[in-house]
Amino acid sequence: MPLDGVYDRLTDVGYAYGPAFQGLRRVWRGDGEIYAEVALPEEQRADAGRYILHPALLDAALHPLLPGVADQDRAALLPFAWSGVTIHATGASVLRVRLTLTGSDVAALTVADATGAPVASVESLLLRPLSKDALRQAASTARDGLFRIAWNTLPTTDTPTDTTDTTGWAVVGDLTVDGASRHADLGAVANADSVPDTVLYAPPVPDGDVPEAAHAALRDALSTTQSWLADDRTTDTTLVVVTRGALATREGQHTDPVQAGLWGLLRVAQTENPGRIALLDTDTDTIPTTALTTDEPQLALRDNTFHTPRLARTTDQPTDRPRWDRGTVLITGATGALGTVLARHLVTQHGTRHLLLLSRRGTNAPGAQELQQELTALGATVTITACDAADRHALTSVLDDIPAEHPLTAVVHTAGVLDDTVLADLTAERLEKVLRPKVDAAWNLHELTKDHDLEAFVLYSSIAGLIGNAGQANYAAGNTFLDALAQHRRALGLPAVSLAWGLWAQASTISGQLDQTDLRRLARLGLLPLSSADAMDLFDAAPATGEAVLAATRLDLGTLRKQGAH
């Protein structure tokens, strides 16, 4: 039987298996019997001898019983009771399996190794049915897949003291630090007779409208950071980049999205160049001499108190959930993989009846017309329009055409592109390419809809901006801009949430560029893929947290603890 895409299909109905558990190799169907060959991945086979029967291999042996594998109409079933279990051999890494169906919910199991030698037999395996809704509820990550960014007060034992010697410090920019030498620019620091141990640098804040200023600030930061990191004279000097009010450390604080973008870019610089750069966001131009006597790479100073960012569990708050079944819902990037998943979800689960789907190619995008037909058949009125939301005039025209009888009530911005490379090789052109659909489009959506009575304004951000994923300085910068924009809107009393997505199992413009090496690297970092079903559970659960910025991801907390991650 064909197995192409079988685990993607299983993921979509709630069975999310990681690479180690995707063991099905071949399946045959006979009269009342199913035959299968299952195997451990190469990297897992060395562990087979540690088990009587490797758990991933045993699990894979039952995968032919899952919905849509050997039987398209099979209901979701779970193993409930085993009887008559006999073990003949241990340590197998490849199995040949015969499943004999003795009833609608009973099967016998015979297992051999690759040579045909007996491994195990099960006289009776009792299965229990499980509805798809129950399966999704059981598999849902909504309770443990949403994380807020908590700015924790620095513990007293780690709080800097007032005895800091600043004679080895230098200042560049609009800052005041007692005892530190002042230089015109970072080049002057590198050219000094004695290069300081620590340099506090306040990047200039460009004039112009917000998107223009954000682009200019990030171009300047990219060039400055590249020059600093490439200069052998500064390899032993810590560069502390100081922003002012870029981020919100608590609900209701105003942010500066222009400076917030710097945090995304520089978090990647930190990842790629450990120990070279620190980040400090302040509410004052006068920096206490205690600011850098801690090992924390990222700090916020508020009212003379230091705070450090951590991911923390969310809790539900008494807040209204958005109504997706009234008015028109606008989705950007709507014909991409993530936008398509969302559009289907809103129509089938929330009763959305008027969708305005924007993408650069409109109905010429692959699958766009089929999506329109599918959602129309479900009772929705679907308009797919070719529009680059970063083009303010084009977006204005589209918004003006929304009929008054179905006014705009929600915006979801999913658009984005990747152009990954290490920071040292990143060019201004590649930076601009990635920023445009994030910064320009999101700001246009904000400004052009801020006077509408919106139920929801959702930004699809990325955890890359929060953790500084190596090779994604441009993408991280665009996404921390989105996070700050959500906080900016909330401070204005407008609806907004920025979802910093982790890895999706669903193939997309973003995840589709990841090979198996990338996926294993992310797994080692503790990032696991989200099924489309789980991602939509998180989408639905996000408003109840009351947070403006959320990391929406599956995390392997055991892996994170082993790494000493926070």
Spans of model-derived segments:
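N-terminal flanking helix/linker immediately upstream of nucleotide/cofactor-binding cores
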Residues: 317-319
